[in-house]
Amino acid sequence: MGPEPAGATVRPTFAKSALIRSKIEGIDYAVNPYYGCLHGCRYCYAAWMTRRRFPDHVWGLHVHPKVNVHRLLDRELSSARPGLLGIGTSTDPYQSIESRFQLTRRCLEVISHHPGFDVSLLTKSPLVLRDLEVLRAIDAEVGFSVSGLGDAVRLLEPRAPPGEARLAALRRLSSEGLRTFAFISPVLPGVTDRQIRTLLRAVAEARPSKVLVDALRFRPGVLQSMRSALSSSPDLLRELGSYASDQAWWLQRARAEMEEAAAGLGLSLEFLF
């Protein structure tokens, strides 16, 4: 949640629009206050989307704050048909530089003046707690994505806050009465499947309103990026190769193990694969 990592390039920019029609089922509009994300997660599907706009950028080391996004949002919501706003569909709205630019907060404040729009926000950062009161005021739903706990996941999430910190923040928001969800995504071979019971127990203790689970999907460049990140870990490379060679079998096995563990915890899981 602190300053941007060494070597990062932050270049403020002016966006042309704030609302984007979403292709995600159930979400009408996407709102992303930043181009790029400093978390640098090596499995992120948004990396290739950012590279299309900025071909020379290194994923995780370049970010463009959309410094006018809140003003655009105010204007566009005035004429948009009411619907669900998904905040953070291709960036983390609470990545470290949000503490400096406060663009996500400003967007939330704008939304509070436009009744009729629901909000579902996804993050990996406890910085979201800063905005608890405005999130409560607009009855926002807040989700945290988490694929694993401890050091096992760090090679693939080099600058994201630890999973334990995310779940602690999730528990705080749940205890404050906000609608919350845990998003176990992506299910990572050699990581998520090796700590299913531990992870699901920690998720259950955070008391989310719901728990979603999604698969690792190989968007353009993702497999290559993951292989590079895991080059120092032969075991994880082998697990990744096993998944890549037979995703259907691997996911069927992982789902069965997760369902069994969740049943023992009284936890209901909603699978998106």
Specify the residue positions occupied by each region the protein language model found:
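Conserved Radical SAM active-site core
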Residues: 1-141, 149-151, 167
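Auxiliary Fe-S-binding modules of radical SAM enzymes
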Residues: 1-14, 20-21, 194-273
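Hydrophobic faces of well-ordered beta-strands that scaffold small-molecule active sites
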Residues: 29, 85, 119-121, 142-144, ...
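Conserved radical SAM core fold
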Residues: 51, 86-95, 126-129, 141-160, ...
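Short, electropositive alpha-helical surface patch
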Residues: 101-102, 136-147, 192-209
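Surface-exposed amphipathic alpha-helices with a cationic face
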Residues: 112, 136, 170-175, 259, ...
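Active-site glycine- and acidic-residue-rich loops that bind
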Residues: 120-121, 187-197
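Conserved strand-turn element in the central/C-terminal portion of the radical SAM core barrel
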Residues: 159, 172-192
